[in-house]
A protein has these predicted regions:
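Hydrophobic alpha-helical connector segments
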Residues: 74, 88-116, 158, 165-169
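Amphipathic alpha-helical interaction segments
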Residues: 28, 105, 123-126, 166-174, ...
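Short, basic, alpha-helical segments at the C-terminal edge of helix-turn-helix-like DNA-binding modules
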Residues: 47, 77-83
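Short alpha-helix boundary/capping elements
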Residues: 69, 80, 115-118, 132-133, ...
Length: 236
């Protein structure tokens, strides 16, 4: 009898036959595990609870994902990639706008991507608290990828070379770090897009304040980080 891809025998112990789950089903289980870890953290989440929520045996869970630590690491990596994919979609949906309005939309999108259902950053927050070295590496990679997305959008949408270079050098590195950190904080406080919208809009206003200052200030007379900190104090 021909078995389906998700029903292929994997291993046998006693009377139990392990069956290899399809890639789609494995991704569904990782999403379920993500919700469990996001609610309780790594230490307080048991593999029994994850298996029960997923509707599979604990043995099958371990057979596919290994130890709880390995599963948590996969969840954190997947969460970061989901957030980046969601951010790309958000950027793609931004209409043609003047540079400063585009920056405002990008800042809001970066913040709100952290509190959306897809890619919610709560599990990343737990990772940074409970598995710092691993999660920090994933987070740094996400920062770099997000900076690249910002620079690509600015390069595509801003025809003026002066505007592009000023923003890429003096705004993007600081704005991305700040927006992602703020989004992470909102996710930790259990905000959803509806409740985070006003906070994101206000914070994006600070980023626009900085961008305007950068574009209007003579070369060599400002520092992006100090300018952003000053703007944050003024809108607080």
């Amino acid at each position: 009898m021909t078995t389906k891809s998700f029903d292929r025998p994997r291993a046998q112990t006693g009377n139990e036959v392990f069956r290899w789950l399809s890639e789609q089903r494995q991704q569904q289980i990782l999403k379920i595990a993500e919700r469990q870890f996001a609610a309780r953290g790594f230490a307080s989440t048991t593999t029994i609870a994850v298996a029960k929520a997923a509707g599979i045996s604990e043995a099958m869970l371990h057979n596919h994902f290994g130890t709880k630590q390995k599963m948590f690491q996969k969840v954190v990596e997947r969460n970061s990639q989901d957030r980046l994919a969601a951010l790309r979609k958000r950027f793609f949906s931004i209409p043609d706008l003047p540079p400063l309005e585009c920056i405002e939309s990008m800042a809001q999108s970066t913040i709100l991507a952290c509190v959306d259902d897809t890619g919610n950053a709560s599990v990343m927050a737990w990772g940074l608290m409970e598995m710092l070295e691993f999660a920090a590496d994933v987070y740094r990679a996400e920062l770099g990828a997000t900076e690249a997305l910002w620079n690509a959008e600015i390069g595509t949408r801003c025809g003026d070379a002066f505007v592009r270079s000023r923003l890429a050098v003096h705004l993007v590195p600081y704005a991305v770090h700040a927006c992602m950190a703020f989004g992470l904080w909102l996710a930790t406080l259990r905000h959803k897009p509806a409740t985070a919208q006003a906070h994101a809009r206000q914070y994006a206003g600070a980023v626009v304040y900085v961008a305007r200052a950068i574009l209007n200030t003579p070369p060599g007379s400002f520092e992006g980080a100090a300018c952003l900190a000053r703007a944050q104090r003024e809108v607080a």
